[in-house]
Amino acid sequence: MTAPLAGLRWGLGPGWLLRLKRCRRSAPWDLGIRSSASRKELLGLFSLNNDILSQSCRNYQAVLCTELTKPLIIRNLPSPSLQPHEVRVGVHYCGVNFADILACKGLYQEKHCLPFTPGMEFSGMVMETGANVSTVQEMLWPIPEGVSYEEAAALPVSYGTAILALDHRARTQPEETVLVTAAAGATGLAAIDVAANVLKAKVIAAAGSDYKCNLALQKGAAHSVNYTQGSLKEGVKKLTDNRGVNVVLDAVGGDIFKEALHSLAWEGRIVVVGFAGGAIPSVPANLLLLKNVSALGVFWGRYREEDFPVFSSSLSSALWHCQERRIQPHVGAVFKLEEVNEAFSRVTQRKSTGKVVISMK
């Protein structure tokens, strides 16, 4: 009997232990078994196969950050014993996120004690369940039929963020105009996908090259602006007949955020999901007043602690929309585990489009 499942945690590797209660950030990039009540916020997708429950791993490979700002290393570690409230997971794919890179530089909001295994999302197979596990509620989600392991690993962080930002926070309505910055990144393409194909909004994509703008158009954006070739604000004004946009999803920060904020229409909403540009901007309160606009934030992982039903719903919705083919995650590159540092460099150097994933197989 096989039942597809999906789950959440932090780490890089093919199989690990997952404690079925809310934990502190841990990582999916362990190539064996991993779980710790001292970590939080891991996302992934699995399928349960009772035919292999007799299998156990004596050792596993794990990606470790042993020194901040230094290359990651891979080590063979002994597998811990399966505890009553844990499941053993064989990981197939892991997603790479900008937050992982920040964590390995010591720049992320949540700090980790060295050494730690980075990572936030994965897909794989449940290999074994602890004696007290009767159902999976807070860490694992079913992978629907027709959704691949590769697609599943690309969904949680990017699409969970996009759904929360555009639907739950900004309350985006059909036919509204949505501006997406960093449009060719993982969250940007997910936001375009959700806005255009689920919420039926009109999307303006903003990116830093013609190639990235063209990719955003292929993925559902109605228009694009290359903000390295002119003013984002002026580009949006031309595309909207000076009306501005109803919603902005910004992952860049800095000057791009400021231009996007000035591009809002009356009663517009700007949702901050990150600061990939490095600079954290301030918000001029007089502009909020004059245009009656709202500035909102989304830290998707925090919802797991503060409002778990909303958190879980965002991931379940992403999986369902993917099964129905309303959305389709864009995997821009696949790396092997031993190429993890190259994968990090691809994201850091802005060479990637969509989601970068690590294959454990």
Whereabouts are the PLM-identified features?
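Mid-domain Rossmann-like dinucleotide-binding core that forms the NAD(H)/NADP(H) cofactor-binding site
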Residues: E150-G230, G235
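N-terminal mitochondrial targeting presequence
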Residues: M1-Y60
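A short N-terminal beta-strand-loop micro-motif at the entrance of redox/enzyme domains
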Residues: R19, S38, N49-L53, L64-Y93, ...
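C-terminal hydrophobic helical "lid"/dimerization subdomain
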Residues: T2, G7, S26, K40, ...
